[in-house]
């Protein structure tokens, strides 16, 4: 594939092109890259010819097809046109696995090629209910997604407890209470009330970092923004039993937002850096912003517990860069 991404990456490397995936290249830069791709593919094609001979593989190399030739390109465009007309090729917005280095999304099969163990933050923080003097204890492994936070999820069928800790009332998943208290080394606490997750539905909360993110503060004025939602996918066996939902960075989160007509706030560019819409976090690569967000939570008295968690996480099979889940407008070839 002369213009395949692996070939383009190799050509960029040989040409000394950095950040070559950007769309603001000049016409001459595009021509140079195309020429570099042709040179690269022909160089390695000769090596593959020799490998075929060494393995005793008989192929008609004189009749090889090249993807940069007009007859191939025209046939591909014809097929794509037909797919679009038949509704097979569609354009839409979805959460995809995205490589910040290659600047491209990956398919499910590509994502499954690159899982490895990583250490991520395990962050417990608290948010105050707007109309009650109570705090939701929320868990996340990706602090940067607090910038795009829209909802907090509970499981409708599971039990949650209101717990008095010193002068505050915390709301946490019942089966997670004991472990959370042990992690915090809290022995003196009192369970005041037990409720189902469904009973917390619709309660509005105050995001602790709104002063840092003015655009998010505007979204927060909407009635269906920064509210508790009860959804069956919420896992009460990890964290605090409550999870924050970021439609810009999670598939379940996104689907929940679409179902509930919640607007999606996504101040993240193609390089996976926060844009001006992210306020004080503007310009940060999203994962680099994790530490600053933790510090800001701590300064506001909203950080409950910080730790680390080791888990499997996907990386790009081409460049080994950790992927980021982003809501993006993409083209999809529908197979079912």
Say what each PLM segment does:
Residues 21-24, 60, 193-199, 284-285:
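Short, solvent-exposed coil/turn linker segments
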């Amino acid at each position: 594939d002369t213009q395949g991404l692996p070939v383009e990456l190799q050509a960029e490397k040989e040409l000394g092109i950095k950040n070559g995936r950007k769309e603001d290249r000049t016409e001459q830069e595009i021509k140079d890259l195309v020429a570099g791709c042709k040179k690269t593919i022909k160089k390695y094609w000769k090596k593959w010819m020799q490998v075929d001979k060494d393995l005793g593989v008989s192929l008609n190399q004189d009749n090889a097809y090249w993807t940069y030739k007009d007859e191939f390109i025209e046939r591909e465009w014809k097929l794509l046109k037909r797919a679009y007309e038949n509704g097979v090729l569609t354009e839409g917005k979805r959460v995809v696995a995205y490589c910040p280095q290659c600047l491209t999304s990956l398919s499910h099969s590509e994502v499954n090629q690159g899982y490895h163990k990583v250490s991520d933050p395990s962050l417990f923080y608290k948010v105050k209910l707007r109309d009650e003097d109570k705090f939701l204890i929320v868990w996340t492994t990706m602090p940067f997604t607090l910038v795009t936070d829209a909802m907090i999820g509970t499981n409708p069928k599971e039990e949650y407890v209101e717990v008095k800790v010193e002068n505050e009332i915390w709301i946490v998943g019942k089966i997670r209470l004991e472990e959370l208290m042990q992690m915090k080394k809290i022995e003196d606490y009192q369970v005041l009330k037990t409720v189902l997750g469904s009973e917390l539905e619709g309660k509005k909360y105050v995001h602790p970092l709104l002063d840092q993110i003015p655009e998010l503060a505007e979204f927060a004025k909407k009635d269906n923004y920064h509210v508790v939602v009860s959804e069956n996918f919420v896992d009460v066996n990890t964290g605090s039993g409550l999870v924050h939902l970021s439609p810009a960075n999670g598939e379940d989160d996104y689907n929940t937002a679409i179902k509930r007509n919640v607007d999606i706030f996504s101040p993240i560019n193609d390089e996976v850096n926060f844009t001006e819409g992210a306020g004080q976090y503007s310009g940060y690569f999203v994962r680099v912003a994790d530490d600053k967000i933790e510090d800001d939570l701590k300064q506001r008295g909203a950080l409950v517990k910080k730790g680390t968690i080791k888990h499997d996480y996907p990386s790009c099979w081409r460049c080994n860069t950790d992927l980021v889940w982003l809501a993006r407008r993409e083209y999809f070839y529908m197979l079912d």
